[in-house]
Amino acid sequence: MATVAATTKVPEIRDVTRIERIGAHSHIRGLGLDDALEPRQASQGMVGQLAARRAAGVVLEMIREGKIAGRAVLIAGQPGTGKTAIAMGMAQALGPDTPFTAIAGSEIFSLEMSKTEALTQAFRRSIGVRIKEETEIIEGEVVEIQIDRPATGTGSKVGKLTLKTTEMETIYDLGTKMIESLTKDKVQAGDVITIDKATGKISKLGRSFTRARDYDAMGSQTKFVQCPDGELQKRKEVVHTVSLHEIDVINSRTQGFLALFSGDTGEIKSEVREQINAKVAEWREEGKAEIIPGVLFIDEVHMLDIESFSFLNRALESDMAPVLIMATNRGITRIRGTSYQSPHGIPIDLLDRLLIVSTSPYSEKDTKQILRIRCEEEDVEMSEDAYTVLTRIGLETSLRYAIQLITAASLVCRKRKGTEVQVDDIKRVYSLFLDESRSTQYMKEYQDAFLFNELKGETMDTS
């Protein structure tokens, strides 16, 4: 009798590729400085602007040492000279532990809250509080879990949990909630777990090495750890880092913590903030908390009006003020809300408090290097001649325009089944998409055909 072997079809497993969005400054990893705060010509995505990066490195070092809280720095320069890039480099160099808040000057204007409230919230987002607390935990390897269910099917479950370390073994009685937590986390014999005595939270650390041969096959997420040594009950110091704004929101209303996720914070009363400041100061004196002055970055700062600048003057003198970094591309222009002109559109009394860092236009060599970095970031292969043409376009028009042509040229190259962007691809997208100067020239030629044209033979100011 012939037997037919059943064949099982194994489904094909495909690797899921994580896609990350490519932003204008996603290639920046830091300021590109060495240990002596000397900038390298091209490092960590930063190119050129050596003097500005050196100055930013000095500011960065003072922020790390906590010696510059309440100071303000202005990065001033022409459009497309890397002002925002320097600020983003500082944020990357500071790391995740130091709060960094970035806003645009026009973000503070809202119908829902006042300008000063928006600035206050931005300031308090940029100040972190590192709170230390000691908790008692039980850490050990699960030897056995016994759960007794009532014979009638009704009533509460009871059980026993046996935990061990290399030196001791103990049996714990379990209540209904702990049994539910163990079942939910799928805890079984051989798992190494920790139980927070205050909250009852159970955390799985992994499987014990002694149980490595229990199963023939295990998933890639299975982690093996050593069996804990010493006592089962231990005291552990836990550090929480939150911003002052998060504490404000939680204490401002009954369901304040929900507002953190919805973003509907509204205006917060000054009395609430004063109470929180007093409590944080008390924790600081007792050694329970530590203040971390962070960084608030305001881009396009010339968009603020005279009332906002007046508020900044006062806020910088506060004992809980972050480092304020501002960027502007304006020269001598009118202060918003007044008829007076001032350098960068900022009042003189605030300019007097600022450390001003200037940026200069990129050279041809730097422009070419930046375009190479952007091509690597966007996975675009380009010929040397195409780099030269694109660099010339960047120098004659703007660096931003040249960077935007990279993706468009790559798409044109793929459509013709090419693997490397050539000069013809650059020329084609250059003819399809106008830059600012060619667009202005086009409008001047056909000004009578446009609706509501106000030029009337006058020279158009495009500065």
Curated annotation (Swiss-Prot):
The modification N-acetylalanine is found at residue 2. Keywords: Acetylation, Activator, ATP-binding, Chromatin regulator, Cytoplasm, DNA damage, DNA recombination, DNA repair, Helicase, Hydrolase, Isopeptide bond, Membrane, Nucleotide-binding, Nucleus, Phosphoprotein, Transcription, Transcription regulation, Ubl conjugation. InterPro entries: AAA+_ATPase, P-loop_NTPase, RuvB-like, RuvB-like_C, RuvBL1/2_DNA/RNA_bd_dom, TIP49_P-loop. Disulfide bonds: none annotated. The keyword DNA damage applies. GO terms for biological process: cellular response to estradiol stimulus; cellular response to UV; chromatin remodeling; DNA recombination; DNA repair; establishment of protein localization to chromatin; negative regulation of canonical Wnt signaling pathway; positive regulation of DNA repair. It holds the Pfam family TIP49. GO terms for cellular component: centrosome; ciliary basal body; cytoplasm; cytosol; dynein axonemal particle; euchromatin; Ino80 complex; membrane. The keyword DNA repair applies. One of its GO terms (molecular function) is RNA polymerase II core promoter sequence-specific DNA binding. Its EC number is 3.6.4.12. There is a cross-link at residues 9, 444, 456 (Glycyl lysine isopeptide (Lys-Gly) (interchain with G-Cter in SUMO2)). The modification Phosphoserine is found at residue 437. It catalyses: ATP + H2O = ADP + phosphate + H(+). ATP binds at residues 77-84. Gene3D superfamilies: 1.10.8.60, P-loop containing nucleotide triphosphate hydrolases, RuvB-like helicase, domain II. It is found in: Nucleus matrix; Nucleus, Nucleoplasm; Cytoplasm; Membrane. Possesses single-stranded DNA-stimulated ATPase and ATP-dependent DNA helicase (5' to 3') activity; hexamerization is thought to be critical for ATP hydrolysis and adjacent subunits in the ring-like structure contribute to the ATPase activity. Component of the NuA4 histone acetyltransferase complex which is involved in transcriptional activation of select genes principally by acetylation of nucleosomal histones H4 and H2A. This modification may both alter nucleosome-DNA interactions and promote interaction of the modified histones with other proteins which positively regulate transcription. PANTHER family: RUVB-RELATED REPTIN AND PONTIN. Belongs to the RuvB family. Forms homohexameric rings. Can form a dodecamer with RUVBL1 made of two stacked hexameric rings; however, even though RUVBL1 and RUVBL2 are present in equimolar ratio, the oligomeric status of each hexamer is not known. Oligomerization may regulate binding to nucleic acids and conversely, binding to nucleic acids may affect the dodecameric assembly. Interaction of the complex with DHX34 results in conformational changes of the N-terminus of the RUVBL2 subunits, resulting in loss of nucleotide binding ability and ATP hydrolysis of the complex. This is RuvB-like 2. The gene is Ruvbl2.
